[in-house]
Amino acid sequence: MPKILIGIPVLDNIEMTRVCLQTLYKHTSVDRLGLDVSLVIIDNGSSDDIAGLIKGEFNGARFPTYYLRNPQNLGVARAWNQVLRFSASATYGSAFYYNYYVISNNDVLFGPDWLQPLVEAMETDDRIGLVSALENGSPVMQELLDAHSRTKKYRVSPKKHYTSENIMGSVKMIYKKWGGHESFCRFVKGNNLPLFIKGNRSAVCFMVRPAMIQQVGFFDEDYSPIGISEDLEYFLRIERIITPPWITENTYPEEKKWKYGFCGKSIIHHNWCMTRQGLHFDGRKWEKQKEKNWKAKFGKSKKYYTKHFLGMFFMPILSSFLEDFLLCLPFH
């Protein structure tokens, strides 16, 4: 019985978190593979009552749910690493307790039977280190790109007050032409996409293999809480473009690089860039500071790395990467 830990970092956005958890509990199927699933919420210093939400609305949930609160925002990389080090049954920080770990944004709505296909993809090849769920915007199918365009039109504004009902209403409009999000997920699953689509990347909702973390390392926590674009750094590390001192030809040879990609049978909806936005969040200032942090750490800009290496390894998603950045800037 494979043990799976799902970790969701949260910073406020209680209404978005409510909808995220509602769809998680509804659509996390386990019977086909006999999965033993647990959930941990990493609260990165929220002022919203996230603990009250979990203890109240989600008390007695389908599978064990744990809550870990940081006294302040420690950044996404620290929260991701807290997920990887978490265990309710073993000493915190000891060897990996779970067979696989899922890390997801809290601005995600999960589609029907989203989890089991991720495990099935991992089980096809023990050199797959990371596999991501498909989302609106994944560049593997035109309808996913269409859904991304509709998301830009209908998503709730992070600059205005919204409720869980507003969120579900926006999702209904986004997927109306397909009969709703659940119907859209079934449509995508029925299009015979490969179980594992190698080479694409997303850090919105992804599963990792502990052996890869042991070899390549944990996520980079420098410059927290703003960070350095931890997901980009990690994918470049997997490709051996960025090599911390512990990555050498002996410890991580070129011919043994880990594989990563999308799972063609796992579909979610992403409410683009709602994880850290709010009434007083300045996305442009945040991204500028990330760029400064990146250049201070690596000596060259992120633009240098995306120009020289994204085109080499990530060309299928380059346009989507740029589009996502523009979408994440604040509303005017």
Which stretches of residues belong to each language-model region?
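Glycine-rich, basic loop-to-helix element that forms the pyrophosphate-binding segment
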Residues: N70-S94
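A short, conserved alpha-helix in the catalytic core of glycosyltransferases
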Residues: G199-G217, S224-S266
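Short, acidic, metal-binding catalytic loop of nucleotide-sugar glycosyltransferases
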Residues: Q22-L35
